[in-house]
Amino acid sequence: MAAREEVLALQAEVARREEELSSLKHRLAAALLAEQESERLLPVSPLPPKAALSQDEILRYSRQLVLPELGVQGQLRLATASVLIVGCGGLGCPLAQYLAAAGVGRLGLVDYDVVEVSNLARQVLHGEALAGQAKVFSAAASLRRLNSAVECVPYAQALTPATALDLVRRYDVVADCSDNVPTRYLVNDACVLAGRPLVSASALRFEGQITVYHYGGGPCYRCVFPQPPPAETVTNCADGGVLGVVTGVLGCLQALEVLKIAAGLGPSYSGSLLLFDALRGLFRRIQLRRRRPDCAACGERPTVTELQDYEGFCGSSATDKCRSLQLLSPEERVSVIDYKRLLDSGSPHLLLDVRPQVEVDICRLPHALHIPLKHLERRDAESLKLLGEAIREGKQGTQEGASLPIYVICKLGNDSQKAVKILQSLPDLDSLLVQDVVGGLMAWAAKVDGTFPQY
């Protein structure tokens, strides 16, 4: 028995190390690519002045040319403007699409990621045939088909402290369409150091928000958020979900603000934050705090005079991928391969699925008992009663005096670890073996059952 436990512990530790190694390899590849790009980034010359619109341009942009607020001079400004878009996902796609359609002269596209099928519900520049291609090349191709006169400059790399300032200085306006906190601080600081306005938006579930930082003496991102939030409190779209239309609404609002800045009209949301609630169909505008004299980036005596280690500052990685928690020891975890062996052996046990009901409706293992993590966190009496009954029923298949092991599973292996901690703290269960399944159901789909849905 002791030997078997050691094998399980070692296998769990190997799985954990493999996951860490995979993450490190990804970061190394991104860093090497960024290093290469920083060494061979071609100079981007300023767009030449434009004295008049061609006959084709007058026809193409005729509906906006007749707007007195824009007119010919505004269109000429757009034609010589350049915009850097950080992130070619749910926000960046509609933003870039409308900027290209409106005739902005140059669009810089920054994204290290590739197109995945799960992107297509909201990232409207990409298509099924382009799965696996770098997002910036997919987006650039779509934009060129829309408007061949717009220059698209793809940067297939992660934005890093080594490259950000150089890139930002090449463009007139910057749009932050990223989905992680370290990149938000990085883009903000680069814009402050380069003296560029920053149009920033975010979207999650049915909600979104947009503002403009560092414009006309207004606040920057650090004025509003001097310190990053605890990493464990941050939810991204992969974890929390998002309705594609919501990212479309916010991306279009970003495009509107960028166009007004580029045309010389000025933005609407410098110093204020627009909140969008799609479920209730409401927009709400709130005033942000003014520029802080003691701001570390844009204050009177700034301490951020160069770009820094933002992943270290924020305690999280600069990616929109789900971060893996390490809350349990190897002895408290089991791989999906080992769990499959246990399942096939017919050994009595209880599998507890702690995902929300909405995820269980997508897919589930038929033999699992479902109790959402939130019910365990609040010690819901009905849920604990259900768990107790399942344990008593399961024990009927064990030898007399033997305990019933409990295995906890979720989507990715994070919530299951939290659930194990809770179960271990319950007095009625403290004598039972409780382990989480490493990698959750997505690991099950990848390593055990290729027909199991991934979401």
From Swiss-Prot:
Kindly indicate whether the keyword Signal belongs to this entry: no
Checking Pfam families in the record gives:
Rhodanese (PF00581), ThiF (PF00899)
What is the predominant subcellular site recorded for this chain?
cytoplasm
Q: What does this protein do?
A: Plays a central role in 2-thiolation of mcm(5)S(2)U at tRNA wobble positions of cytosolic tRNA(Lys), tRNA(Glu) and tRNA(Gln). Also essential during biosynthesis of the molybdenum cofactor. Acts by mediating the C-terminal thiocarboxylation of sulfur carriers URM1 and MOCS2A. Its N-terminus first activates URM1 and MOCS2A as acyl-adenylates (-COAMP), then the persulfide sulfur on the catalytic cysteine is transferred to URM1 and MOCS2A to form thiocarboxylation (-COSH) of their C-terminus.
Q: List the disulfide bonds.
A: C314-C322
Alphabetical list of Gene3D superfamilies matching this protein: NAD(P)-binding Rossmann-like Domain, Rhodanese-like domain
- Organism, as annotated: Sus scrofa (Pig)
- Is Ribonucleoprotein given among the entry's keywords? no
* Catalysed reactions, semicolon-separated: [molybdopterin-synthase sulfur-carrier protein]-C-terminal Gly-Gly + ATP + H(+) = [molybdopterin-synthase sulfur-carrier protein]-C-terminal Gly-Gly-AMP + diphosphate; [molybdopterin-synthase sulfur-carrier protein]-C-terminal Gly-Gly-AMP + S-sulfanyl-L-cysteinyl-[cysteine desulfurase] + AH2 = [molybdopterin-synthase sulfur-carrier protein]-C-terminal-Gly-aminoethanethioate + L-cysteinyl-[cysteine desulfurase] + A + AMP + 2 H(+)
Q: Outline the extent of the Rhodanese domain.
A: 345-453
Q: Name the EC number(s).
A: 2.7.7.80, 2.8.1.11
Residues that coordinate or bind Zn(2+): C220, C223, C295, C298
Cysteine persulfide carried by residues? C410
Q: Which residues form the active site?
A: C237, C410
Q: How is the cofactor bound?
A: Binds 1 zinc ion per subunit.
Q: Name one GO molecular function term.
A: molybdopterin-synthase sulfurtransferase activity
> What InterPro entries does the annotation carry?
MOCS3/Uba4 (IPR028885), Rhodanese-like_dom (IPR001763), Rhodanese-like_dom_sf (IPR036873), ThiF/MoeB/HesA (IPR045886), ThiF_NAD_FAD-bd (IPR000594), Ubiquitin-activating_enz (IPR035985)
Report the locations given in the UniProt record. Answer: Cytoplasm, Cytosol
Protein name stated in the entry? Adenylyltransferase and sulfurtransferase MOCS3
